[in-house]
C-alpha cells in the first residue's frame, strides 16, 4: 500500500457500508494516516496491508494484510480484510485472507494469527471460518 492508493482507499474506507462495524467511515485525512501507519508497519516489521486488485484488469477491490494489534495488553498478529460493497460475496475477502494467513504461518513463522471481528459482523466471521479460524474469545 502506497500514497498512490489514497483515492481507492478513500473509496473503501470512506464507504459507510464497508465501515459499518467501525465507529464511522473515514475522512481523506484519516485514510492518509491509515496508509502512513501501514507503511510504518512495513518499515518496522517487514509486512502490513496490501491492496487487493483484480488479476486481469488491475481494478481496485479492497485491502487485506497482517498487522500487530494490542488485545488485552498482549500483542497479537491480526489478519484483516475489507472489500468494496460491489465486490463482496465473490470470495475475494476469503482469497485475500487465506493468502495472508499462509504468509503469516509459512513466511513469518507465526504461532497464532487472530482476526478481531465485531460480533455482529457475520460476513467477516464467515470469511474467518472459511480459512480455518475458530472463535476463541467473545
Where are the regions a protein language model picked out?
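Short amphipathic alpha-helical/adjacent loop interface patches that line ligand
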Residues: 35
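Short glycine-enriched, charge-decorated loop/helix-capping segments at active-site entrances
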Residues: 25-26
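A short helix-loop-beta-strand connector motif used in the catalytic cores of GNAT acetyltransferases and
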Residues: 38-51
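Acyl-donor (CoA/ACP) binding surface of acyl/acetyltransferases
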Residues: 1-21, 49-138
Amino acid at each position: 500500500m502506497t500514497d498512490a492508493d489514497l483515492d481507492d482507499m478513500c473509496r473503501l474506507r470512506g464507504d459507510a457500508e464497508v465501515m459499518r462495524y467501525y465507529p464511522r467511515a473515514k475522512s481523506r485525512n484519516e485514510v492518509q494516516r491509515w496508509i502512513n501507519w501501514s507503511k510504518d508497519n512495513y518499515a518496522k516489521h517487514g509486512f502490513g496491508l496490501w491492496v487487493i486488485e483484480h488479476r486481469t484488469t488491475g481494478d481496485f477491490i479492497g485491502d487485506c494484510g497482517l498487522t500487530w494489534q494490542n488485545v488485552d495488553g498482549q500483542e497479537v498478529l491480526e489478519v484483516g480484510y475489507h472489500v468494496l460493497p460491489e465486490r463482496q460475496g465473490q470470495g475475494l475477502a476469503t482469497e485475500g485472507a487465506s493468502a495472508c494467513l499462509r504468509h503469516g504461518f509459512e513466511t513469518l513463522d507465526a504461532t497464532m494469527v487472530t482476526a478481531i471481528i465485531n460480533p455482529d459482523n457475520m460476513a467477516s466471521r464467515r470469511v474467518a471460518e472459511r480459512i480455518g479460524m475458530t472463535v476463541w474469545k467473545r
